[in-house]
Design a protein with these regions (language model features):
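Sec-dependent signal peptide recognition
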Residues: 1-9
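N-terminal signal peptide c-region/cleavage motif recognized by signal peptidases
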Residues: 12-14
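Structured catalytic-domain cores with a bias toward divalent-metal coordination
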Residues: 18-584
Length: 584
């Protein structure tokens, strides 16, 4: 009722009373968080209080019909994308509530925004940048409110749910972009082109003293100059947090072996389904902020607020230089590059020992689950010395296409829609006669045993090989020489971890649709053996060396079917092609 009253005052009697800019969280001593109606009220209230410095707007609508609210704040007066570009101001996107149960970012963001506007925090910083604040990304999930949505989290009393109303995890959706909410977010990103994106979370895990983790890319991946900037940005924010009493970490604190502190930690680069794995591919800065769920809600909100303010201070000081480096990275990514492109990353075998602020613990078999369980004593801090592998190197690399990719007409419409979501350049082609291309054929394939985000995934191995094909009118040419060339490869390279192929978009091309009956194959096999001594030798060798093959009638007949003229030569052939020169 109080929120409704506030909204009525805001919309009908603005001259009589200024609406409060405090949150339910603040008023409750940070024991509670407000419902989404509060976000709607506060969004308009900030704009009403600071009409020349704040604008409230909708950037999308959720599947359940709720508005997706954003606030843009800058004391420069640049409150739309065109004005920000004209003034040359860096844009910072701060995103809360992608997992709506981890809602620290909403309340911390409103707190930081108010203090920034009132000059209590980072005075003058909003003159030199534009802050784009999305309090709650997963709006429908936020309204699935319950006290039991995060049983391993200390506060608030009630909170939202991890996934959307369609049960999609938005923090697995940046590249495949299937959720309507993600499509709206990408449109927002394309419009504003933020230099830096800050994704606010609260992590699960073991019990330890460290209260927050700050992870940044580019750091191990991406443009070399931006990698240097990424480390500078991360280290500066961590230093600010430490000065304010936090115990920040520069890596995600998940044990190598679940629930075993002695196993230590491994660092890496997240795939582009995640925010920090996505934005470096756009030549922009991404920061993942993870407060620790075992910390109380007041502690988590405070450390998140401190992070947001530190980010704003760093962008105010360095944003112009960093923005220039990002533009230069766009140019560099558009140039020919003879070096192999990394698709995945992993830590090498190099190990070092680090100090980690944990608690005394025991590991004993559980009489409930039967598993070995770790129990922590939070009254007894303990300095652990644990292994850390953080020498992160490319794991899977592939040669870059000479010019780009060709998407045949039968797949053009839906691939084009995906390319547009990521603001990628492509061209529709007329019919093409015999054209030199590279084609990828899988030598091994593995379908996911269970669905992931509603899809059956596919992992393939294979090689690109030269081939001549004809393409009908309407095929797409996606050039590699464009600023977001890394995103092009992430989507269209078949072995990339979040490619369209990996997410099951082309599974039907890897399913056998035609076959040879066993009684036919028996006779065909005998004819082939009689005509081809080399084939007979190969068959007998396989029988002698492969016991599983020898024991399988189906495998033995398939040996001959695959070598027969009736075999489907298009099976296991990836329909997207590579091309070495511009086909236009």
């Amino acid at each position: 009722m109080r929120l409704i009253t506030t909204l009525l005052l805001l919309t009908t009697l603005p001259a009589l009373a200024a609406p409060p800019l405090t949150t339910v969280a603040e008023e409750s001593g940070f024991t509670r968080t407000g419902r989404y109606a509060e976000v709607e009220v506060l969004c308009e209230a900030f704009a009403a209080r600071y009409p020349t410095a704040v604008r409230c707007f909708d950037f999308g609508t959720t599947p359940q019909g709720r508005p997706m609210k954003a606030l843009v704040a800058s004391t420069s007066g640049a409150l739309d994308p065109l004005a920000a570009r004209r003034k040359g101001l860096p844009v910072v996107l701060v995103q809360g509530g992608i997992h709506a149960g981890e809602i620290d970012g909403k309340d911390a963001g409103f707190l930081a925004l108010r203090e920034l506007l009132e000059g209590e925090a980072a005075p003058g910083a909003l003159d030199r940048q534009v802050l784009l604040f999305v309090p709650v990304f997963n709006v429908d999930g936020h309204e699935r409110f319950s006290a039991w949505n995060r049983p391993n989290q200390r506060g608030p009393v009630e909170m939202g749910w991890r996934t959307t109303a369609q049960n999609l995890n938005l923090n697995r959706d940046y590249l495949k972009a299937e959720a309507p909410e993600m499509q709206a977010m990408l449109a927002l990103v394309n419009a504003w082109d933020p230099l830096a994106v800050v994704d606010l979370h609260a992590t699960n895990g073991a019990q330890f003293e460290h209260d927050i983790a700050i992870m940044v890319e580019p750091l191990f991946a991406g443009d070399p100059a931006l990698r240097t900037i990424g480390q500078q940005w991360r280290d500066a924010v961590i230093a600010d947090l430490a000065e304010q009493g936090s115990l920040p970490l520069p890596f995600y604190p998940s044990f190598v072996v679940y629930d075993d502190p002695a196993s230590g930690f491994t660092d890496s680069v997240a795939p582009p389904r995640f925010s920090t794995g996505y934005f470096w591919m756009r030549n922009r800065l991404g920061m993942l902020v993870e407060t620790h769920s075992w910390r109380t809600y007041p502690e988590r909100v405070r450390s998140t607020r401190n992070t947001v303010v530190s980010v704003i201070e760093q962008i105010a000081e360095h944003g112009q230089d960093w923005q220039r480096a990002a533009r230069e990275a766009d140019v560099a990514a558009s140039q020919p590059d003879p070096t192999p492109a990394p698709l995945t990353f992993a830590a090498s075998d190099k190990v070092r020992t680090i100090d980690f602020r944990g608690y005394a613990y025991t590991r004993e078999p559980s009489d409930v689950s039967g598993a070995l369980m770790t129990r922590y004593d939070e009254t007894t801090p303990q300095l652990w010395q644990v292994p850390m592998r953080d020498d992160v190197q490319p794991a899977i690399t592939v040669p870059r296409p000479g010019a780009g990719y060709l998407v045949p007409a039968e797949h053009a419409a839906r691939v084009a829609a995906k390319l547009r979501l990521h603001d990628l350049v492509f061209h529709e082609l007329p019919a093409m006669a015999q054209t030199q291309v590279q084609s990828f054929r899988a030598t091994s394939k593995k379908f996911g045993a269970s669905p992931v985000e509603g899809r059956q995934t596919l992992a393939v191995e294979g090689e690109w090989a030269d081939e001549t094909v004809a393409l009908g009118k309407g095929a797409l040419y996606v050039p590699i020489r464009q600023p977001r060339s890394r995103l092009v490869m992430a989507l269209l390279e078949p072995r990339a971890p979040d490619s369209l192929l990996a997410w099951g978009w082309f599974n039907n091309h890897f399913e056998a649709k035609e076959y040879m009956e066993a009684y036919v194959a028996e006779d065909v096999a005998r004819e082939m053996l009689a005509k081809d001594p080399a084939l007979r030798e190969a068959f007998e060798k396989r029988l002698a060396e492969d016991a599983d093959f020898a024991a399988s009638p189906a495998a033995r007949l398939d040996f001959f079917y695959r070598r027969h003229a009736s075999y489907d030569q298009a099976l296991d052939r990836y329909p997207v092609l590579r091309v070495g020169s511009d086909p236009r």
